[in-house]
């Protein structure tokens, strides 16, 4: 999770900030549910970029957190690359606060270094939609898999019979996909009846 900082979040204009924040937290919660090794990093946190948003640091109090004093691309920071290598993973799920810089730069570098990179575009953002589209196109051309957080979550769950993660995954969908929550509520009403209306339960 790259540069999701209080200051830089304000620069995202191609998606509502409330939706953007929700997407980032959904991805973070998914990583937590599946016990994925997670790395946080921030650029120039003591300046206008600001601190990492507190929801992330609260979710991952023990995660490696790399504060970069200079490098714009996280992959240009030796500590960040060392933290990635220490996970032992060859597949990387990456998101950065800005798609065209914070995500695309390290994603391209990681791909060139031999990693299988999944770039989560809706947990990243841009100044405008054209910049977002061009950045995603460039990553796809390089062989990076550009996906959204819901696809990542569903892919990791894969089967609702995986009981150790199913409840957590369902909760993430309920919290961060409004239509899914409404659908579930509607189903429960049909199944259990609507209180006060004396509607029959389905046996």
Feature locations, PLM:
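Active-site acidic carboxylates
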Residues: 1-65, 69-70, 86, 133-140, ...
């Amino acid at each position: 999770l790259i540069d999701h900082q209080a200051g830089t979040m304000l620069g995202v204009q191609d998606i509502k900030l409330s939706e953007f924040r929700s997407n980032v937290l959904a991805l973070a919660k998914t990583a937590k549910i599946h016990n994925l090794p997670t790395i946080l990093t921030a650029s120039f946190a003591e300046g206008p970029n600001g601190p990492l948003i507190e929801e992330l640091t609260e979710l991952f109090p023990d995660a490696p957190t790399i504060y970069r004093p200079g490098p714009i691309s996280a992959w240009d920071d030796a500590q960040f690359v060392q933290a990635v290598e220490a996970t032992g993973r060859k597949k990387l799920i990456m998101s950065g606060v800005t798609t065209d810089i914070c995500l695309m730069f390290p994603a391209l570098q990681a791909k060139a270094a031999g990693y299988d990179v999944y770039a989560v575009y809706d947990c990243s953002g841009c100044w405008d939609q054209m910049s977002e589209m061009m950045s995603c196109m460039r990553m796809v051309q390089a062989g990076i898999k550009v996906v959204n957080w819901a696809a990542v979550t569903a892919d990791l769950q894969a089967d609702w019979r995986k009981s150790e993660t199913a409840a957590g995954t369902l909760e993430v969908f309920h919290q961060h996909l409004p239509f899914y929550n409404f659908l579930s509520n509607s189903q429960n009403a049909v199944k259990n009846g609507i209180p006060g209306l004396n509607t029959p339960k389905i046996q």
